[in-house]
From Swiss-Prot:
It is found in: Cell membrane. The chain crosses the membrane at residues 20-40, 222-242. GO terms for cellular component: plasma membrane. The gene is hptS. Its main location: membrane. Residues 297-513 form the Histidine kinase domain. The keyword Transcription regulation does not apply. Its EC number is 2.7.13.3. It holds the Pfam family His_kinase. InterPro entries: Bact_2-comp_sensor_kinase, HATPase_C_sf, Sig_transdc_His_kin_internal. This is Sensor protein kinase HptS. PANTHER family: SENSOR HISTIDINE KINASE YPDA, SENSOR PROTEIN KINASE HPTS. Keywords: ATP-binding, Cell membrane, Kinase, Membrane, Nucleotide-binding, Phosphoprotein, Transferase, Transmembrane, Transmembrane helix, Two-component regulatory system.
Amino acid sequence: MTAYKPYRHQLRRSLFASTIFPVFLVIIIGLVSFYAIYIWIEHRTIHQHVDESQSSLHHTEKQIQTFITQHNNSFQELDLTNHHDVTATKRELLKLIHQQPATLYYELSGPNQFITNNYEHLNTKNMYLFSTHQLKFKNSTYMLKIYIANTPRLSEIKKDSRQFALIVDQYDNILYANDDRFTIGEKYRPQQFGFMNESVKLNHADHRLIIYKDIHENIEDGITLLIVMAVVLVLLVIFGFISADNMAKRQTKDIETIIQKIYYAKNRHLGTYTPLKNNSELEEINNYIYDLFESNEQLIHSIEHTERRLRDIQLKEIERQFQPHFLFNTMQTIQYLITLSPKLAQTVVQQLSQMLRYSLRTNSHTVELNEELNYIEQYVAIQNIRFDDMIKLHIESSEEARHQTIGKMMLQPLIENAIKHGRDTESLDITIRLTLARQNLHVLVCDNGIGMSSSRLQYVRQSLNNDVFDTKHLGLNHLHNKAMIQYGSHARLHIFSKRNQGTLICYKIPLSRGNVDV
């Protein structure tokens, strides 16, 4: 076997060769651009945080407004001079406060009444007056003030990113701050150097939310060096992997070709043998794929041939079992007619010979529907001789339907079943209605015979699923199994019947094997 250089050696050389130059380039660019990148990242982070904080506060404001709107009617029924109503009001307001993702305090003030959840008597001047609402109660109108002491998002931003939050009014008076360097009530005067900030409008009162950061604390020599080294390392790894990946793509092109051939083999479209472009160990795998594909194709063809033979044998066996049942009854009729009416007996023999010629035709299992209908008419004619013309056959079909191709002997069992199980002392009317719909032939066979009881109908329906060679009831069972063999599960046979009301059989025959419409 020819010795080939391992891929890992080539990838290693590629990794070293492609990272020497990037080392110098990254160091130079990294040192120069570090500060700009850092500033850009911080500005981007602050912008993101101010948007998130604004969204969180707007969401809280909307929830509070929705809650108050929904409970306006409830508040109007409460009398705050009543101790129980005061308790109910506190419970509802606490529910409102606890539903919000922030530390909130409320003050409800009115005539001779003051309610709050500020049990620790915290100074509300250090909080942000978030919203005010007028609430109508049964006895008077009260003013509800809601203060924000803090929010989880602002605390998280302060803890993780060391970015602080301010809320100022339209005149830059500080209304809220979570940094001790700012005093509530004073003017906000942003620093020009060493600080980054981003602001956004908070409400209709022109209050603004400001997120700022003091970057003096982060610019230190040790941290700068670590960041630069980390950036250099990351870039080196990225460049190294890119280089190795490019080399791997060139070296693994034959592997991709083999994978593609496996895909073609899976879908049976591999074609003739084609060697790989590069002479390597992979050629042995390539040879094995073609050998395995050829063996698999031979096995598939053998299985398909065996399945076709099995279907042919089953169809022949079913057709063979149809004939003795009918021949026995017809021969008895001919024997009876030879004595009474030799001419009529001759007619029956001619009709029987035509039917046998049709049913024993072996060159094809399919016929035109018109031929099948002629066969049925001859069949009914012979049965009428036996039963004194008591059977009336009506066929309703378009000319297009009559020229469709179906399996041989696919309709005769339906008529045989109607005569055998529907005939009574009175005349029997049988109607065959044939329609075409969505590449399916729909056959409806309806008779006015004695019908079946519900228990008998259930038994007949269950017998359709019995194996064709295991049941003694050959009529509809044979037809159903024959349809399953010839058309697969796309064929459908449904039986409906009531005692003394006749029987209806609905039969769907696919005109295309690819049709799966039900």
